[in-house]
């Protein structure tokens, strides 16, 4: 499998590059960061999958470039609205390429979200507190936003 990593100089992107390089059955097709062209990379070095850890403000342009560039997308970038997701579904249908969006790739955080969702059924008050390094790009984080959404799924309202 050929993989391009978009946002390869960030913490998560660099981790994915390191992982791909350590595997015998996965080839690094491209390593893209700010100033590089994802479209040019996909044209000159096609990939089966693009793993994206870029910035929320370019999320839709990036996903469109990946799908219409002939690759499936694994997206760790946050900030997608319901309308964005509907548009992405249309692109997936049109291109026949898959798109997986996850606001957090850490198993412990995914479990924490499920625990918070379940606990929300039993409480009338909840608070999400985050602590991040000083270079954190998105605040509140996609993880916090998704956790809050999950907690409110069963018609719960928290102020």
Segments the model singles out, each with a brief description of its role:
Residues 34, 78-80, 104-106, 131-134:
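Short, ordered loop/turn segments at secondary-structure junctions
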Residues 64, 77-99, 115-118:
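Rossmann-fold NAD(P)-binding glycine/threonine-rich loop
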Residues 72, 87-106, 122-126:
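Rossmann-fold dehydrogenase core element
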Residues 43, 49, 53-76, 85-87:
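Rossmann-fold NAD(P) dinucleotide-binding segment
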Residues 6, 53-54, 76-77, 102, ...:
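Structural motif
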């Amino acid at each position: 499998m050929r993989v391009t990593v978009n946002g390869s100089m960030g913490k998560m992107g660099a981790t994915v590059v390191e992982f791909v390089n350590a595997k015998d059955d996965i080839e690094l097709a491209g390593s893209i960061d700010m100033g590089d062209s994802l479209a040019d990379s996909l044209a000159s070095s096609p990939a089966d999958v693009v793993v994206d850890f870029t910035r929320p403000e370019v999320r839709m342009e990036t996903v469109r470039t990946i799908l219409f560039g002939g690759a499936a997308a694994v997206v760790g970038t946050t900030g997608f609205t319901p309308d964005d997701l509907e548009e992405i579904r249309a692109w997936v249908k049109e291109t026949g390429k898959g798109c997986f969006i996850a606001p957090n790739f850490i198993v412990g955080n995914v479990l924490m979200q499920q625990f918070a969702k379940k606990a929300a059924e039993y409480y009338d008050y909840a608070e999400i507190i985050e602590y991040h390094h000083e270079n954190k790009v998105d605040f509140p984080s996609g993880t916090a936003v998704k956790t809050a959404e999950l907690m409110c799924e069963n018609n719960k309202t928290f102020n």
